[in-house]
């Protein structure tokens, strides 16, 4: 709790008393302002981290807790990325969710996109597989987007083509994609296979253009954050 006060003091704000979700909403707003307006990424992250730690007692008594927790995590992820600390992102998320299948869809989407952007899609492979195969996530908002991102930004770039085909044909694929989308996905996979045979050293350039033509449909859940173009990530 003192960490939360300290982080807000550094931002020049008077810390609200931590007596419920309304105060944590103010803290979340402060973190967002620090991140987006002031560009104070370290203090924004510290505010999110402290806010998450302060939520322990609230979790059992307020149904807004899940939304607040996700909000702190999403801002914290972006702040870490801006600080060029993207390697810490998923382990930090797991400190607060403990089980991979419990991570909200919008956070999975953000993590997949980040690790794809920095050229480390393998980091999210196992977590995405576990998440998609958890029965309680099948009906979750954003399930289809996680499946699309996993296919296009993890399996295909890694060259795991057989697993990509299996995903499309599996129960997950049937739930996530329409018949037309499944065919498009298979076309992308076969294009990757063809390019790998023709030029094993550099199969990805034309495929990247094809993937860009069929982006994952996040349906407005994800707004592409500043870190996607941050110079430190190149």
Where are these regions (language model features)?
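N-terminal pre-first-transmembrane soluble regions of secretory-pathway and organelle membrane proteins
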Residues: 1-147, 151-156, 174
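Polar/charged alpha-helical tracts
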Residues: 43-46, 187, 213
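TPR/TPR-like alpha-solenoid repeats
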Residues: 79, 114, 153-154, 184-196
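Flexible low-complexity scaffold tracts in large eukaryotic assembly proteins
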Residues: 144, 148-149, 154, 170, ...
């Amino acid at each position: 709790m003192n960490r939360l006060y300290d982080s807000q003091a550094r931002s020049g704000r008077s810390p609200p008393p931590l007596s419920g979700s309304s105060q944590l909403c103010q803290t979340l707003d402060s973190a967002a302002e620090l991140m987006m307006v002031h560009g104070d990424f370290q203090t924004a992250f510290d505010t999110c981290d402290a806010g998450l730690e302060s939520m322990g007692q609230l979790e059992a008594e307020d149904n807004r807790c899940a939304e607040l927790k996700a909000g702190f995590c999403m801002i914290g992820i972006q702040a870490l990325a801006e600080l060029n600390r993207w390697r810490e992102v998923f382990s930090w998320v797991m400190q607060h969710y403990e089980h991979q299948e419990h991570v909200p869809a919008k956070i999975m989407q953000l993590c997949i996109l980040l690790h794809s952007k920095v050229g480390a899609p393998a980091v999210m492979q196992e977590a995405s597989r576990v998440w998609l195969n958890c029965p309680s996530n099948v009906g979750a908002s954003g399930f289809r987007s996680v499946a699309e991102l996993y296919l296009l930004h993890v399996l295909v770039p890694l060259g795991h083509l057989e697993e990509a085909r299996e995903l499309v044909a599996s129960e997950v694929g049937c739930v996530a994609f329409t018949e037309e989308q499944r065919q498009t996905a298979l076309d992308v996979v076969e294009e990757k296979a063809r390019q790998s045979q023709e030029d094993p050293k550099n199969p990805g350039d034309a495929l990247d253009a094809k993937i860009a033509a069929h982006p994952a449909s996040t349906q407005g859940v994800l707004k592409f954050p500043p870190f996607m173009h941050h110079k430190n990530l190149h």
